[in-house]
Amino acid sequence: VKIHGKSGHGSMPSLAVSPIDCFHTFYMALQSYRMRKVSPRNCLTYSFGMVQAGDTPNVIPDELTFAGTARCFVNEDGLSFREDFWKLLKDICDNYGCTAEIMEDQYFPVTANNKECVDLARKAIAERVGDVMEDTEPWMASETFAITESTYPGLFTFTGVKNEALGTGANHHTPEFDIDESGLKVGVEAALAYVLAMLEEKPEIKSFHKEDLKLMLERAE
């Protein structure tokens, strides 16, 4: 997002419209959003990973650019946050005499596995590969595969690549990240076991209702 203000000199701030002041007010106002709008039973988080404005200490810049992400486990929470985010930003920009320009806005739905697909995979993988599947805690990484699962029933799994003997298993997006490539073999075997079971059994996925997701996907466009 880019906030446009009016540049000026630090000796006469009254002649400028500071996008920094505008962003600060917006940032603070957003802090209370979760307490006011998100059920305590649900989880929503957001962060700004980039804020850039100006390059001279005595000059008020004419624009500020910021970027970040929001994560949730309930699509309705994410879509509501998205709508309220833009409304709050517009209102505060109007108050300060600034304008906001949307540089990029993407929404990926929550990645939610279909239970019947999970049950089929668990059985098939146990028979063909062994007891290698584990349940995990919900994870807030954004995932484009969620778009596929919004149209077709399926499941999303992780392949274990941690091996303390080799020193692998550091968190993603860190300099220490590395993988134990032998884990990829198990991942391929597990994927094939699931695909073969799906082709052989051709289960009826009764819990998947594509029409239920239509409004959510339209709202996310």
Regions found by a protein language model. Name each.
Residues 48-54, 214-221:
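Short, mixed-charge aromatic SLiMs
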Residues 22, 28, 32, 83-87, ...:
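His/Asp/Glu-rich mid-to-C-terminal helical/loop segments that flank catalytic regions of hydrolases
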Residues 5-7, 52, 151-152, 161-163, ...:
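A broadly conserved detector of short glycine/acidic/proline-rich loop/turn motifs that flank catalytic sites
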